[in-house]
């Protein structure tokens, strides 16, 4: 590793530790020439994932865009930001494990819905309303009835339609 102080190419590792939740390795190094100490990080290079939007447009996967959508859906719920970041990390890891480098936005939306459903019904409905492009009250009612049937299958419900 090249020293940032004198540009010498030889250094020794003084200390290594896992960082960023196991996603990188932090190394303290010392230049063998000038004895300057510096820190480097080693990260796994993630392969790019392309998202195919509903209109056919292709975009690079943007974890911050996904996180923003989830934060908005979870406003005024008990789900904290760190939990949402963890969910996004899990979704991103899932995408990296897929053999295909392209994925439809609907598949990502379904992953988010699975997580949010376990966290908060309110967040689930909010995200589903945007992701599913709800057109009106009937779409909300259908989704609420589906949630209710799945949560309490032994009950019988009157439908509004």
Swiss-Prot record:
Protein name: Transcriptional repressor NrdR
Keyword annotations of the record: ATP-binding, DNA-binding, Metal-binding, Nucleotide-binding, Repressor, Transcription, Transcription regulation, Zinc, Zinc-finger
Domain of life from the UniProt record: Bacteria
Stretches for region Disordered: 1-21
GO terms classed as biological process: negative regulation of DNA-templated transcription
PANTHER family named in the record: TRANSCRIPTIONAL REPRESSOR NRDR (PTHR30455:SF2)
GO molecular function, one term: ATP binding
UniProt record similarity statement: Belongs to the NrdR family.
Zinc finger region(s), unnamed: 3-34
This protein's record includes keyword DNA-binding: yes
Record's compositionally biased regions (Basic residues): 1-11
Cofactor-binding details, from the entry: Binds 1 zinc ion.
Cofactor(s) demanded: Zn(2+)
């Amino acid at each position: 590793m090249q020293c940032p102080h004198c540009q010498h190419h030889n250094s020794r590792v003084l200390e290594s530790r896992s960082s960023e939740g196991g996603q990188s390795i932090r190394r303290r190094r010392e230049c063998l020439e000038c004895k300057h100490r510096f820190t480097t990080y080693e990260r796994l290079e993630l392969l790019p994932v392309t998202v195919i939007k509903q209109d056919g447009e292709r975009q690079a996967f943007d974890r911050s865009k996904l996180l923003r959508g989830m934060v908005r859906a979870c406003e005024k719920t008990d789900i904290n930001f760190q939990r949402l970041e963890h969910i996004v990390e899990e979704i991103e890891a899932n995408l990296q494990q897929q053999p295909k480098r392209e994925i439809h936005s609907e598949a990502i939306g379904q992953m988010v819905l699975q997580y949010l459903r376990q966290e908060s019904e309110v967040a689930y409905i909010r995200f589903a309303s945007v992701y599913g492009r709800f057109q009106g009250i009937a779409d909300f009612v259908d989704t609420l009835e589906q949630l209710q049937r799945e949560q309490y299958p032994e009950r019988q419900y009157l439908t509004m339609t």
